[in-house]
């Protein structure tokens, strides 16, 4: 009897050893178990098993769907650091069914995993299945796969990948955080890319297939190396934050049918330079191009009817915003974006220099309209201006001369202009409410409404021709002897010794400096 039992045991051991050699690795088994999908009543389970071999190979056998585990219930989770290779065995002949799915979180955190074999029977991969597999640089996905869960390869070491032909949707966060990702081959039938699919990935260039018609928010946000993107031809909406914080993005080929540039779409794209918005664009969202520091000029297409606030704020090199002929909602005045009806200043480009004359009829300064205009020095303000919205003049550090055409503004309006204590408020003689030498604590001075603004002429230019020469000595002498008059701007330039008086001492100093060939 004992010999019979021993014989049976040896036979079973031999059969098991033979099975391990034929189906999987010949190495000793570290651990094993069942992993098949339970039915809704937990009364029956798919015939699927797993085993981890001593050499780090994790093997799967059986048929049907793998149980969709939660993060903490993956049976081999405690061995994550030991797993180097995953092999999912296919059928031994075409008549046998086989494994159809890979569970969510199946191999998440397997930092030493370098090789994966997936049979052509698998149709679905669960969310985060290969998340944070830092050593996994390549993987071959069979064309049988029709569906993938969120973040399948998030923060993995993938460098390149070919996506399955049956895949129509690229899920949320598929390649998010894949810092080494270099290239992706897209399937011909791909129609949708969900939010953050490539965010924080290492892509440098990417051309998306024209079959894609929907892309959700933040698809390429925070891709530090991304330089060039060609968007799908039929994409109509560039969603919120799609390229946010892509610091090296230089060139974008927009879809010819694009209608909406979403909020924050190109926020903080530091190297984005000039581009052409398609004529089809109708809406530019809130802060769409905010802080694009290399942008030098932009043209608003004729069909644009909505430009939300701060769309181009903080673009320090932006010299001008142009508007295409025929636009019914907006216009460009001296490179500054305004509403077509002339009642609101929308955006002053960040690199605007010198002087801007706000046209008569303007009633409103939009929020952040003059934000960070460091090169703007003088502003002419019409009597019609009544409203300045939030932070309309933030960080205009060199804007020190304000020329008012109307009555003295109230304290509330001046406060919203964020005027420096070093600034001078110029006003027209006869306009009510003004006081001299100060008004509400600000230094004041007269001007005559001339296009030659006080403070804009070089010292000594008493005739206002933009140059300083002997003619200015003659002109100043004529003024002092009552032979001719000078404007307020010329009078300020004539005060060459800066004592707030124009007299013979200024004439003498001007003559001496010209004779000596020195500047004032």
Identify the function of each model-found stretch.
Residues 36-39, 89, 323-325, 351, ...:
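Short, solvent-exposed loop/edge segments of extracellular or virion-exposed proteins
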Residues 49-50, 105, 309-310, 356, ...:
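Short, T/G/N/S-enriched strand-turn elements that build extracellular solenoid repeat scaffolds
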Residues 57-64, 81-100, 111-124, 134-147, ...:
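Structural signature of tandem-repeat unit edges
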Residues 16-24, 451-520:
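Cellulosome-associated attachment modules in secreted, modular CAZymes
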Residues 103-106, 126-129, 149-152, 171-174, ...:
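Consensus positions within tandem repeat domains that build extended binding/scaffold surfaces
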């Amino acid at each position: 009897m004992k010999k019979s039992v021993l014989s049976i045991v040896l036979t079973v051991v031999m059969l098991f050893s033979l099975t391990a050699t034929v189906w999987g690795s010949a190495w000793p088994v570290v651990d094993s178990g069942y992993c098949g999908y339970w039915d809704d009543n937990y009364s029956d389970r798919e015939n699927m098993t797993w085993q981890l071999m001593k050499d780090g190979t994790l093997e799967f056998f059986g048929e049907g769907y793998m149980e969709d585990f939660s993060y903490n219930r993956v049976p081999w989770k405690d061995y994550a650091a030991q797993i180097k290779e995953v092999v999912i065995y296919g059928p031994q002949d075409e008549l046998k069914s086989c494994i159809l799915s890979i569970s969510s979180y199946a191999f998440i955190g397997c930092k030493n995993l370098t090789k994966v074999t997936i049979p052509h029977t698998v149709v679905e991969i669960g969310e985060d299945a290969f998340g944070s597999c830092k050593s996994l640089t390549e993987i071959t996905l069979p064309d049988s796969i029709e569906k993938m869960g969120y973040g399948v390869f998030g923060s993995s070491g993938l460098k390149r990948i070919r996506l399955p032909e049956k895949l129509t949707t690229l899920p949320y966060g598929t390649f998010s955080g894949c810092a080494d990702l270099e290239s992706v081959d897209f399937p011909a039938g791909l129609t949708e890319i969900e939010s953050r699919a490539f965010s924080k990935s290492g892509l440098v260039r990417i051309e998306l297939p024209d079959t894609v018609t929907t892309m959700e928010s933040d698809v390429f946000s925070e891709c530090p190396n991304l330089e060039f993107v060609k968007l799908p031809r039929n994409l109509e909406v560039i969603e919120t934050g799609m390229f946010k914080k892509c610091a090296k993005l230089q060139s974008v080929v927009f879809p010819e049918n694009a209608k909406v540039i979403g909020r924050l779409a190109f926020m903080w794209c530091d190297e984005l330079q000039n581009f052409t918005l398609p004529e089809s664009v109708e809406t530019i969202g809130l802060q769409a191009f905010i802080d694009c520091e290399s942008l030098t000029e932009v043209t608003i297409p004729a069909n644009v009817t909505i430009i939300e606030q701060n769309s181009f704020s903080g673009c320090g090199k932006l010299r001008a915003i142009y508007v295409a002929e025929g636009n019914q909602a907006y216009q460009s005045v001296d490179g500054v974006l305004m509403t077509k009806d002339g009642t609101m200043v929308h955006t002053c480009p960040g690199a605007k220099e010198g002087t801007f004359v706000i046209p008569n009829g303007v009633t409103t300064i939009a929020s952040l309209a003059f934000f960070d205009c460091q090169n703007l020095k003088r502003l002419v303000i019409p009597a019609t201006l009544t409203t300045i919205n939030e932070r309309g003049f933030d960080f205009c550090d060199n804007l020190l001369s304000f020329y008012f055409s109307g009555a003295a503004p109230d304290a509330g309006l001046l406060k919203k202009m964020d005027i420096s204590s070093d600034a001078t408020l110029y006003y027209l003689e006869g306009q009510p409410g003004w006081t001299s030498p100060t008004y509400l604590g600000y230094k004041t001075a007269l001007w005559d409404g001339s296009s030659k603004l006080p403070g804009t002429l070089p010292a000594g230019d008493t005739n206002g021709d933009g140059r300083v020469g002997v003619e200015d000595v003659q002109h100043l002498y004529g003024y002092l002897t009552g032979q001719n008059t000078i404007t307020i701007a010329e009078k300020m330039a004539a005060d060459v010794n800066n004592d707030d008086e124009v007299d013979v001492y200024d004439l003498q100093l001007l003559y001496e400096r010209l004779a000596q060939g020195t500047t004032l």
